[in-house]
Protein backbone atom coordinates (compact mmCIF):
# COMPACT_ATOMS: atom_id res chain seq x y z
CA UNK A 1 0.00 0.00 0.00
CA UNK A 2 1.27 3.45 -0.82
CA UNK A 3 0.12 6.97 -1.51
CA UNK A 4 1.62 10.28 -2.45
CA UNK A 5 0.58 13.88 -2.88
CA UNK A 6 2.35 16.48 -4.98
CA UNK A 7 1.53 20.18 -4.90
CA UNK A 8 1.87 21.46 -8.47
CA UNK A 9 0.90 25.08 -7.81
CA UNK A 10 0.30 27.10 -4.67
CA UNK A 11 -0.09 30.85 -4.24
CA UNK A 12 -2.56 33.24 -2.58
CA UNK A 13 -5.34 32.46 -5.08
CA UNK A 14 -4.66 29.01 -6.54
CA UNK A 15 -3.84 25.53 -5.30
CA UNK A 16 -3.36 22.49 -7.57
CA UNK A 17 -2.60 19.05 -6.10
CA UNK A 18 -2.09 15.60 -7.60
CA UNK A 19 -2.74 12.59 -5.35
CA UNK A 20 -1.99 8.99 -6.24
CA UNK A 21 -2.71 5.76 -4.36
CA UNK A 22 -1.81 2.11 -4.80
CA UNK A 23 -3.31 -0.78 -2.85
CA UNK A 24 -2.15 -4.38 -3.16
CA UNK A 25 -4.66 -6.85 -1.73
CA UNK A 26 -3.35 -10.33 -0.97
CA UNK A 27 -5.92 -12.89 0.11
CA UNK A 28 -5.19 -15.56 2.69
CA UNK A 29 -7.84 -17.80 1.10
CA UNK A 30 -6.27 -19.66 -1.88
CA UNK A 31 -9.67 -19.76 -3.65
CA UNK A 32 -9.77 -15.94 -3.86
CA UNK A 33 -7.44 -14.09 -6.20
CA UNK A 34 -5.15 -11.23 -5.21
CA UNK A 35 -5.75 -7.85 -6.83
CA UNK A 36 -4.40 -4.32 -7.05
CA UNK A 37 -6.19 -0.98 -6.99
CA UNK A 38 -4.78 2.26 -8.38
CA UNK A 39 -6.21 5.78 -8.22
CA UNK A 40 -5.26 9.36 -9.07
CA UNK A 41 -7.02 12.65 -8.33
CA UNK A 42 -6.22 16.13 -9.61
CA UNK A 43 -7.66 18.82 -7.29
CA UNK A 44 -7.87 22.55 -8.01
CA UNK A 45 -8.91 25.19 -5.45
CA UNK A 46 -9.46 28.90 -6.13
CA UNK A 47 -9.49 31.28 -3.11
CA UNK A 48 -11.07 28.62 -0.85
CA UNK A 49 -14.32 29.39 -2.69
CA UNK A 50 -14.35 27.32 -5.90
CA UNK A 51 -12.95 23.82 -6.42
CA UNK A 52 -12.80 21.20 -9.15
CA UNK A 53 -11.46 17.65 -9.24
CA UNK A 54 -10.84 14.95 -11.82
CA UNK A 55 -10.38 11.38 -10.65
CA UNK A 56 -9.70 7.92 -12.01
CA UNK A 57 -9.52 4.61 -10.13
CA UNK A 58 -8.94 1.08 -11.39
CA UNK A 59 -9.54 -2.14 -9.48
CA UNK A 60 -8.09 -5.39 -10.78
CA UNK A 61 -10.61 -7.47 -8.82
CA UNK A 62 -13.51 -6.65 -11.15
CA UNK A 63 -11.37 -5.13 -13.92
CA UNK A 64 -13.35 -1.95 -13.23
CA UNK A 65 -12.42 1.67 -13.90
CA UNK A 66 -14.22 4.60 -12.27
CA UNK A 67 -14.02 8.16 -13.62
CA UNK A 68 -15.25 11.35 -11.94
CA UNK A 69 -15.39 15.08 -12.62
CA UNK A 70 -16.73 17.18 -9.76
CA UNK A 71 -17.01 20.86 -8.92
CA UNK A 72 -17.98 22.79 -5.80
CA UNK A 73 -18.71 26.44 -5.01
CA UNK A 74 -18.90 27.86 -1.51
CA UNK A 75 -22.11 29.83 -0.89
CA UNK A 76 -21.66 30.64 2.81
CA UNK A 77 -18.68 30.44 5.13
CA UNK A 78 -18.64 31.91 8.63
CA UNK A 79 -16.92 30.73 11.81
CA UNK A 80 -19.47 27.96 12.54
CA UNK A 81 -21.23 27.17 9.25
CA UNK A 82 -20.28 26.32 5.68
CA UNK A 83 -22.71 25.80 2.78
CA UNK A 84 -21.50 24.44 -0.58
CA UNK A 85 -23.20 23.69 -3.89
CA UNK A 86 -21.62 20.73 -5.70
CA UNK A 87 -22.14 18.92 -8.97
CA UNK A 88 -20.43 16.57 -11.35
CA UNK A 89 -20.46 13.38 -13.38
CA UNK A 90 -19.28 9.85 -12.63
CA UNK A 91 -18.86 6.80 -14.83
CA UNK A 92 -17.94 3.16 -14.08
CA UNK A 93 -16.65 0.80 -16.76
CA UNK A 94 -15.66 -2.85 -16.92
CA UNK A 95 -15.56 -5.41 -19.74
CA UNK A 96 -19.15 -6.50 -18.98
CA UNK A 97 -20.65 -3.28 -17.61
CA UNK A 98 -20.73 0.44 -18.42
CA UNK A 99 -22.79 2.69 -16.15
CA UNK A 100 -22.91 5.60 -18.58
CA UNK A 101 -22.55 9.11 -17.23
CA UNK A 102 -24.35 9.65 -13.94
CA UNK A 103 -24.96 13.17 -12.64
CA UNK A 104 -24.33 13.95 -9.01
CA UNK A 105 -25.33 17.27 -7.47
CA UNK A 106 -26.60 18.80 -4.25
CA UNK A 107 -26.00 21.04 -1.27
CA UNK A 108 -23.59 20.27 1.55
CA UNK A 109 -24.04 21.91 4.96
CA UNK A 110 -21.40 21.69 7.69
CA UNK A 111 -21.89 23.23 11.11
CA UNK A 112 -19.93 23.09 14.33
CA UNK A 113 -21.08 23.94 17.82
From Swiss-Prot:
Domain of life assignment: Eukaryota
Keyword Secreted appears in the UniProt entry: yes
GO biological process, one term: innate immune response
Cellular component terms per the entry's GO annotation: extracellular region
Matches recorded under Pfam families: Attacin_C
InterPro entries, per the entry: Attacin_C
Keywords from the named record: Antibiotic, Antimicrobial, Immunity, Innate immunity, Secreted
Bilayer-spanning residue ranges: none
Locations listed in the record: Secreted
Function according to Swiss-Prot or TrEMBL: Has antibacterial activity against both Gram-positive and Gram-negative bacteria.
Recorded family membership: Belongs to the attacin/sarcotoxin-2 family.
Protein name, UniProt field: Defense protein 2
Organism the protein comes from: Lonomia obliqua (Moth)
Amino acid sequence: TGSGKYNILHNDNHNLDLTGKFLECSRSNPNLSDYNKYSAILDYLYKDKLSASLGVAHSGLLDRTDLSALGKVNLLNDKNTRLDLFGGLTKSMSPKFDSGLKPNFGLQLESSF
